[in-house]
Curated annotation (Swiss-Prot):
PROSITE patterns referenced in this protein's UniProt entry, alphabetically: AA_TRNA_LIGASE_II_GLYAB
InterPro entries: aa-tRNA-synth_II/BPL/LPL, Gly-tRNA-synth_heterodimer, Gly-tRNA_ligase_asu
GO BP term (any one): glycyl-tRNA aminoacylation
Name used for this protein in its record: Glycine--tRNA ligase alpha subunit
Domain of life: Bacteria
Gene: glyQ
Organism per entry: Rickettsia massiliae (strain Mtu5)
Length: 288
């Protein structure tokens, strides 16, 4: 069987979950640290209304900046997120079938669910979870979302997060992300992952670790914090949540620069968590 290109992996997952009944959404146009931060997860997992969606989410973690030199760790990477609310009884079976659609033979390969309860301190989110390992390499995270913004999720939503970059490493049998086949073409049309993303990886790493202005980022954090509070008072939880995301990213940038002490870090986490909580609380009040 021909190995899937990076974009074919995405298309295969989109088609699989579309056939199951998920709405295929688009990436959120904000700097987020993971697919979970998309409002389609944070806000829509709350309340009783059924919600089944899937989407790709480019994600940024300034602290993982490596100037494009690390084989599988980058400050910018891709996740494929699936939310099923309420969580179906056969969600694990659905996930395993999706791996088969990607060409992974479950009879040959060692697929393990390794207990790893998930928590996001800044979102005030948590759930029972498992890392999914394929032949010893983590390729997905599987979570029963029980709490977001400090609010219980009723019903519990099932969350599946595929690490697209690492999953592609395994499927294509290569050792470095930059060597991944991006588009499945040959000759002049062929593209590798490195040709698409790695110059940006180098430049953003330099910015994140050397050139970002900490004083400016501190101002941005406070401005977003104040704006979020103001928008909540105006009953606008969705734009308020955008400001929460901006504050969260500013905090991540400050953390990557190493300008925040351990004590200050705990304080910033609590401040972002407060913003997430008031956004979630207001959203739920307006969407019961």
């Amino acid at each position: 069987m021909k190995k899937l290109s990076f974009q074919q992996i995405i298309l295969t997952l989109q088609n699989y979950w579309q056939d199951y009944g998920c709405a295929i959404l688009q990436p959120y146009d904000a700097h987020v640290g993971a697919g979970t931060f998309h409002p389609a997860t944070v806000l829509r997992c709350l309340g009783t209304k059924p919600w089944s969606v899937a989407y790709v989410q480019p994600s940024r973690r300034p602290g993982d900046s490596r100037y494009g030199m690390h084989p599988n760790r980058m400050q910018h990477y891709y996740q494929f997120q699936v939310i099923l609310k309420p969580s179906p009884d056969n969600i694990q079976e659905l996930y395993l079938k999706s791996l088969e659609c990607l060409g992974i033979d479950l009879k040959i390969h060692d697929i393990r669910f390794v207990e790893d309860d998930w928590e996001s301190p800044t979102l005030g989110a948590a759930g029972l979870g498992w890392e999914v390992w394929c032949n010893g390499m983590e390729v997905s995270q599987f979570t029963y979302m029980q709490q977001i913004g400090g609010i219980e999720c009723r019903p519990v939503a099932g969350e599946i997060t595929y690490g697209l970059d690492r999953l592609a490493l395994y499927i294509q049998g290569v050792d470095e992300v930059r060597e991944l086949d991006w588009n499945g073409q040959v000759g002049e049309k062929a593209l590798k992952y490195g040709e698409v993303d790695f110059e940006a990886e180098r430049q953003f790493s330099k910015y994140n670790l050397e050139l970002a202005d900490s004083e400016m980022l501190l101002r941005h954090f406070k401005d977003s914090e104040d704006q979020c509070e103001r928008l909540i008072k105006a009953n606008l939880p969705m734009p308020a949540y955008d400001e929460c995301l901006k504050a969260s990213h500013a905090f991540n940038q400050l953390n990557a620069l190493g300008v925040i002490s351990v004590t200050e870090r705990a304080s910033y986490v609590l401040r972002v968590r407060h913003l997430a909580r008031i956004c979630c609380t207001k959203w739920l009040e307006m969407n019961k």
